[in-house]
């Protein structure tokens, strides 16, 4: 994979904690991947973050993915923040697994994480669209007042588990219109038409 030029793209894989032994992972410099997202529920947070530290030691950018963020109370989230600060992952992301987050709850979790995490850790949001909040919540995330990098996930046509995710074509248009980005919407729509619509 050494000849694969990623240019400005970060290629990231995902591991559901407990399903992939570390022995199955090559060092990052021998892999096509730049980073790995590790997803886990709160009852596994201690051992999952320890696993994340070992993945990071292999050279990967590690994303600590908090599945079902709405299941965390404040004390549990503070515990997670301490665990994350100890290993300094590339990012910590809120995963709204059932699309339950309303604006107030989203901002509550965001600012708890923003206040507690070390400044070099990016803060992300992975939406699900059960209550049609995915795109709106991504917009709220982008408006949050923070000095750290903010990551918002989206997929072509919003395809994803259950009700799906935030549609990347909408998010890209929003970023172009309000954040001076230059995403090629026609390329996204071409990918949608050529690869996705046949299965919908």
Identify the meaning behind each predicted range:
Residues 1-200:
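Catalytic cores and adjacent flexible loops of soluble metabolic enzymes
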């Amino acid at each position: 994979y050494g000849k694969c030029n990623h240019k400005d793209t970060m290629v990231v894989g995902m591991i559901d904690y407990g399903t992939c032994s570390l022995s199955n992972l090559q060092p990052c410099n021998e892999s096509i991947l730049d980073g790995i997202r590790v997803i886990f529920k709160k009852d596994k947070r201690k051992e999952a973050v320890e696993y994340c530290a070992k993945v990071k030691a292999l050279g990967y950018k590690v994303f600590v993915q908090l599945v079902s963020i709405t299941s965390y109370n404040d004390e549990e989230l503070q515990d997670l923040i301490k665990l994350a600060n100890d290993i300094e992952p590339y990012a910590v992301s809120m995963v709204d697994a059932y699309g339950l987050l309303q604006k107030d709850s989203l901002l509550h979790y965001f600012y708890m994480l923003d206040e507690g995490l070390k400044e070099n850790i990016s803060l992300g949001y992975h939406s699900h669209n059960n209550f049609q909040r995915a795109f709106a919540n991504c917009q709220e995330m982008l408006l949050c007042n923070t000095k750290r990098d903010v990551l918002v996930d989206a997929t072509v046509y919003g395809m994803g588990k259950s009700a799906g995710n935030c549609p990347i074509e909408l998010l890209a248009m929003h970023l172009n219109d309000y954040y001076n980005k230059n995403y090629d919407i026609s390329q996204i729509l071409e990918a949608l038409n050529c690869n996705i619509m046949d299965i919908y």
